[in-house]
């Protein structure tokens, strides 16, 4: 399920030390108990949840590939006609392998996996990686999606700056979605994304991802950006696919060939 390209650095987190399962999760990811930590990890209904302690009214963050919005998108989201599918080159007879170099909560990776791609998620934040692994655990156990999830989705813990170079495998597409400051004040930004951004911070080194991504990808690199953001590392893409609020910048290295 999970590989690590680096030893996880110790990160402070609050959790109930009377629960051995929580203790084991935190030990695995190098998360040390800190009674003054801003964030708390809890288990709710067999699900690892991250709460922001100074904003108890906010809904906790967790990874759920089985139900909710992600499952709805899998069933009704437009299939291979979605912008992200077009961006990575999914088409008749072409199902590329993908490295998601900035996995986050795994939603885009899951969409691509549900459309047939083998996806390796790379996540450097140990708290987010713990949430992802827990989401994968529950997805792998699900009778509906478990079989293909086990085949198509895996997690690598490490910084993409080094992990992309260390993967040592051939991959068609590298997908990047660096954290970028939101300027609008939507409900999503106010709640879930605000919590997430306060945990992981801005990807200040995001420009440094393009070169290793281009070195690893055999076919193309796809960068998801807000519509108002500048090009990653100032490099103009070969083409763009635009949506209502975002765009996918596509850097082409070679043509996609049918299987």
Curated annotation (Swiss-Prot):
Query: Pfam families recorded for this chain?
Result: SAM_MT
Localization in the cell: Cytoplasm
Cytoplasm as UniProt keyword: yes
Question: Which Gene Ontology MF annotations are present?
Answer: rRNA (guanine-N2-)-methyltransferase activity
Keywords of the record: Cytoplasm, Methyltransferase, rRNA processing, S-adenosyl-L-methionine, Transferase
Q: Which domain of life does this protein belong to?
A: Bacteria
- Provide the primary localization: cytoplasm
Q: What is its EC number?
A: 2.1.1.242
What is the enzyme's main class?
transferase
Q: Catalysed reaction(s)?
A: guanosine(1516) in 16S rRNA + S-adenosyl-L-methionine = N(2)-methylguanosine(1516) in 16S rRNA + S-adenosyl-L-homocysteine + H(+)
Q: By its UniProt entry, which InterPro entries does this protein fall under?
A: 16SrRNA_methylTrfase_J, SAM-dependent_MTases_sf
Quote the record's binding site residues for S-adenosyl-L-methionine. 107-108, 123-124, 159-160, 177
Gene Ontology cellular-component terms for this entry are: cytoplasm
UniProt KW rRNA processing keyword: yes
Function, in words: Specifically methylates the guanosine in position 1516 of 16S rRNA.
Q: Name the family the entry cites.
A: Belongs to the methyltransferase superfamily. RsmJ family.
> What protein does this entry describe?
Ribosomal RNA small subunit methyltransferase J
UniProt lineage: Bacteria, Pseudomonadati, Pseudomonadota, Gammaproteobacteria, Alteromonadales
User: What gene name does this entry carry?
Assistant: rsmJ
